[in-house]
UniProtKB/Swiss-Prot annotation:
<dbReference type="GO" id="GO:0003853">
    <property type="term" value="F:short-chain 2-methyl fatty acyl-CoA dehydrogenase activity"/>
</dbReference>
<dbReference type="InterPro" id="IPR037069">
    <property type="entry name" value="AcylCoA_DH/ox_N_sf"/>
</dbReference>
<feature type="modified residue" description="N6-succinyllysine">
    <location>
        <position position="213"/>
    </location>
</feature>
<feature type="binding site">
    <location>
        <begin position="312"/>
        <end position="313"/>
    </location>
    <ligand>
        <name>FAD</name>
    </ligand>
</feature>
<feature type="modified residue" description="N6-succinyllysine; alternate">
    <location>
        <position position="50"/>
    </location>
</feature>
<feature type="modified residue" description="N6-acetyllysine; alternate">
    <location>
        <position position="50"/>
    </location>
</feature>
<dbReference type="Pfam" id="PF02771">
    <property type="entry name" value="Acyl-CoA_dh_N"/>
</dbReference>
<dbReference type="GO" id="GO:0005759">
    <property type="term" value="C:mitochondrial matrix"/>
</dbReference>
<comment type="subunit">
    <text>Homotetramer, formed by a dimer of dimers. May be part of the large multiprotein complex ARC/DRIP.</text>
</comment>
<dbReference type="InterPro" id="IPR036250">
    <property type="entry name" value="AcylCo_DH-like_C"/>
</dbReference>
<comment type="similarity">
    <text>Belongs to the acyl-CoA dehydrogenase family.</text>
</comment>
<dbReference type="InterPro" id="IPR006091">
    <property type="entry name" value="Acyl-CoA_Oxase/DH_mid-dom"/>
</dbReference>
<keyword id="KW-0560">Oxidoreductase</keyword>
<feature type="binding site" description="in other chain">
    <location>
        <begin position="400"/>
        <end position="402"/>
    </location>
    <ligand>
        <name>FAD</name>
    </ligand>
</feature>
<feature type="modified residue" description="N6-acetyllysine">
    <location>
        <position position="231"/>
    </location>
</feature>
<keyword id="KW-0010">Activator</keyword>
<feature type="binding site">
    <location>
        <position position="167"/>
    </location>
    <ligand>
        <name>substrate</name>
    </ligand>
</feature>
Length: 415
């Protein structure tokens, strides 16, 4: 396993320069507490969780503010993460992946997200793209595309959303018309994470008639004539990853780059998104966990009216509620991850529930943490505001939380 060469580190996050504290673990301030994210894990899971926490502390947390403020895409750091197996966490080992489970993946992304939620979210999307190729591609495609994705020598972006089709993804209009041994793509995709920087674009496009059965999945490689990108979007958060439109103008792509059969694209998209919802919910857990620790430490240090804020019962109760909601969200996410791994019939509904609950609750936790920091929480010298901004979009992407409610109710009503 790729973890064999890793040092055995304790699960802790350090301090950012300039007082930008993320998570401190010394003595009684350890994760051995009621919010300990290692509870219920086996020894192997605890070990790679420690590796992920340490990587977040050393490589991500000290840089997350700079990446955010300068809008830097941390290629070198992500490639270091890939050396630990994080570039292809749930990709099969024969093409360079770590071959871990969905639960293992959730544990890792939660830990990494404490160091930089935005960067971890991109890594999770990259993993989802690699999984689609690994799971639905033929052997030639798997061995061509997956190894450089697992090492993050190459980066991947997922192209589903269009200017006119967001939640109604099955109505997408980007066309792929077959001409000989190529498809000619025309159309555009919107809000694509990594666009312009990524090397591999997993594109859902229309090869047939209207509706989901007319959609196919095609890999478009950077540098293909007819592939271009829009301007870099200015965003509230997720600033360590670029977001652009992806544009196809008579873009000729080999038929050999089609993943799966014609008309299978929507199934691939949906299957990928089930896992993507677990991944993004796990990123929310990491942001919320870091925010709870930040708030706990602030309440112990900050004094008003001659007493530490921690002595105020209202603030005690609020902190208790934050911790309780964090643990509840984590349990939901991990339960859904196991259901997805086991391919249970209720997996789609459970993934939707976990994504809905975790992203809503964890954003609320981060936002409450900012409030409890008072004016300091609104300053960019303090990390809590970045967790708020980076976790807000999780309620929108990988299927908005309104769509999650549709999927959950549909599952209940069709029983």
């Amino acid at each position: 396993m790729l973890w064999s060469g890793c040092r055995r580190f304790g699960a802790r996050l350090g301090c950012l320069p300039g007082g930008l504290r993320v998570l401190v673990q010394t003595g009684h301030r350890s994760l051995t507490s009621c919010i300990d994210p290692s509870m219920g894990l086996n020894e192997e899971q605890k070990e790679f969780q420690k590796v992920a926490f340490d990587f977040a502390a050393r490589e991500m947390a000290p840089n997350m503010a700079e990446w955010d403020q300068k809008e830097l895409f941390p290629v070198d750091v992500m490639r270091k993460a890939a050396q630990l197996g994080f570039g292809g966490v749930y990709i099969q080992t024969d093409v360079g992946g770590s071959g871990l489970s969905r639960l293992d993946t959730s544990v890792i992304f939660e830990a990494l997200a404490t160091g930089c939620t935005s960067t971890t979210a991109y890594i999770s999307i990259h993993n989802m793209c690699a999984w689609m190729i690994d799971s639905f591609g033929n052997e030639e495609q798997r061995h061509k595309f997956c190894p450089p994705l697992c090492t993050m020598e190459k980066f991947a972006s997922y192209c589903l959303t269009e200017p006119g089709s967001g939640s109604d993804a099955a109505s997408l209009l980007t066309s792929a018309k077959k001409q000989g041994d190529h498809y000619i793509l025309n159309g555009s995709k919107a809000f694509i994470s990594g666009a312009g920087e990524s090397d591999i674009y997993v594109v859902m496009c229309r090869t047939g008639g209207p509706g989901p059965k007319g959609i196919s999945c095609i890999v478009v490689e950077k540098g293909t004539p007819g592939l271009s990108f829009g301007k870099k979007e200015k965003k509230v958060g997720w600033n360590s990853q670029p977001t652009r439109a992806v544009i196809f103008e008579d873009c000729a792509v080999p038929v050999a780059n089609r993943i799966g059969s014609e008309g299978q694209g929507f199934l691939i998209a949906v299957r990928g998104l089930n896992g993507g919802r677990i991944n993004i919910a796990s990123c929310s857990l990491g942001a919320a966990h870091a925010s709870v620790i930040l708030t706990r430490d602030h309440l112990n240090v900050r004094k008003q009216f001659g007493e530490p804020l921690a002595s105020n019962q209202y603030l005690q109760f609020t902190l208790a509620d934050m911790a309780t909601r964090l643990v509840a969200a984590r349990l939901m996410v991990r339960n859904a991850a196991v259901a997805l791994q086991e391919e249970r019939k209720d997996a789609v509904a459970l993934c939707s529930m976990a994504k809905l609950f975790a992203t809503d609750e964890c954003f609320a936790i981060c936002n409450q943490a900012l409030q409890m920091h008072g004016g300091y929480g609104y300053l960019k010298d303090y990390a809590v505001q970045q967790y708020v901004r980076d976790s807000r979009v999780h309620q929108i992407l990988e299927g908005s939380n309104e769509v999650m409610r549709i999927l959950i109710s549909r599952s209940l009503l069709q029983e």
